[in-house]
């Protein structure tokens, strides 16, 4: 496929998606649509890789230009916002908590969602080695397509050597000194306790499977809690946090044991609608606010 080019940005562009071909005999329209989209995705993989490479190159060039301009304007000093974050924080402290990313939902995700989950896990690892505090993280039910993604699609990741990160195909979850984090519970997580294991659902499903992690935790007898987001901030857009966000928020909490500060420092500015008045929301909350908190 020959990439189209934008003359202004000189970046490759994928061609508009073609119309869905006639449905083959013996297949439903939804089955054919899913298969055809997958085929188109595979067909365009080389082009998407080229687009990502061009965007990274353009971003590097723009950063060099900003850096050069800043150096000229600041007498040779690099502004704080342009300084790179060290890949590893050598002054890290042990948070004392353990985190499990429960990935036992492979069959409930499509290929793109598996890729998205693998990206979230790698970003969670990056956060775990850069933040001021780290946790011992274990990825359970690491098998099937997710493992294949790491072994084949992320060659060179060397994930089996990641520090404070363990991958296992075992699916068993602890039921003592453990908490399953899910937005579908009414119980709020007040604080993070060293010695406790916090379980995060490793699933990207665009909210198709309601109360999935909550029901699993209940079946296993594991207490459930939700992050106290609604008590401190309000979000705009989809009230969904990635696995990366959840882990990073927990690590940031240990900086000052301040949930509000942790949320504001981690969540993208585009998701922050306005800061909530914690004092008012502690005394009263409307049904809409309660629903928002459960949707997060």
Curated annotation (Swiss-Prot):
Region described as Disordered: 1-33, 277-296
Catalytic activity: guanosine(9) in tRNA + S-adenosyl-L-methionine = N(1)-methylguanosine(9) in tRNA + S-adenosyl-L-homocysteine + H(+)
The UniProt record lists the keyword RNA-binding: no
UniProt xrefs under Pfam families: tRNA_m1G_MT
Ranges where the SAM-dependent MTase TRM10-type domain occurs: 85-274
Main subcellular location of this protein, as a coarse class: cytoplasm
E.C. code: 2.1.1.221
Sorted UniProt keywords: Cytoplasm, Methyltransferase, Nucleus, S-adenosyl-L-methionine, Transferase, tRNA processing
BP terms from Gene Ontology: tRNA N1-guanine methylation
Domain of life: Eukaryota
Gene Ontology molecular-function annotations: tRNA (guanosine(9)-N1)-methyltransferase activity; tRNA binding
GO cellular component, one term: cytoplasm
Catalytic residue positions: 205 (proton acceptor)
Entry binding sites for S-adenosyl-L-methionine: 181-182, 201, 205-209, 213, 227, 239-241
Gene3D superfamilies listed in its UniProt record: 3.40.1280.30
Location of the protein in the cell: Cytoplasm; Nucleus
General function of this protein: S-adenosyl-L-methionine-dependent guanine N(1)-methyltransferase that catalyzes the formation of N(1)-methylguanine at position 9 (m1G9) in cytoplasmic tRNA.
Protein family according to the UniProt entry: Belongs to the class IV-like SAM-binding methyltransferase superfamily. TRM10 family.
Subunit architecture: Monomer.
Name of the protein in question: tRNA (guanine(9)-N1)-methyltransferase
Originating species: Eremothecium gossypii (strain ATCC 10895 / CBS 109.51 / FGSC 9923 / NRRL Y-1056) (Yeast)
């Amino acid at each position: 496929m020959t990439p189209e080019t934008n003359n202004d940005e000189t970046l490759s562009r994928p061609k508009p998606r073609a119309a869905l071909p006639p449905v083959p005999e013996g297949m439903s329209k939804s089955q054919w649509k899913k298969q055809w989209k997958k085929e188109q995705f595979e067909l365009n993989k080389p082009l998407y890789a080229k687009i990502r490479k061009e965007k990274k190159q353009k971003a590097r060039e723009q950063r060099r230009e900003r850096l050069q301009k800043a150096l000229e304007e600041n007498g040779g000093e690099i502004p704080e916002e342009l300084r790179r974050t060290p890949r590893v924080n050598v002054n890290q402290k042990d948070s004392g908590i353990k985190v499990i990313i429960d990935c036992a939902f492979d069959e409930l995700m499509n290929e793109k969602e598996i890729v998205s989950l693998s990206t979230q896990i790698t970003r969670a690892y990056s956060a775990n080695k850069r933040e001021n505090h780290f946790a011992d993280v274990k990825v359970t039910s690491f098998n099937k397509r997710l493992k294949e993604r790491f072994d084949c699609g992320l060659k060179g990741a060397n994930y089996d050597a990641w520090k404070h990160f363990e991958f296992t195909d075992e699916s068993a979850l602890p039921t003592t000194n453990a908490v399953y984090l899910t937005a579908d519970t009414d119980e709020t997580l007040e604080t993070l306790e060293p010695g406790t294991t916090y379980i995060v659902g490793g699933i990207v499903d665009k909210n198709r499977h309601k109360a999935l992690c909550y029901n699993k935790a209940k079946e296993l007898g594991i207490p459930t809690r939700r992050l106290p987001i609604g008590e401190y901030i309000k979000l705009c857009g989809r009230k969904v946090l990635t696995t990366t966000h959840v882990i990073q928020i927990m690590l940031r909490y240990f900086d000052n044991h301040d949930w509000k500060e942790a949320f504001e420092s981690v969540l993208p500015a585009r998701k922050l609608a306005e800061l909530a008045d914690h004092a008012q929301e502690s005394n009263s909350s409307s049904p809409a606010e309660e629903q928002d908190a459960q949707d997060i």
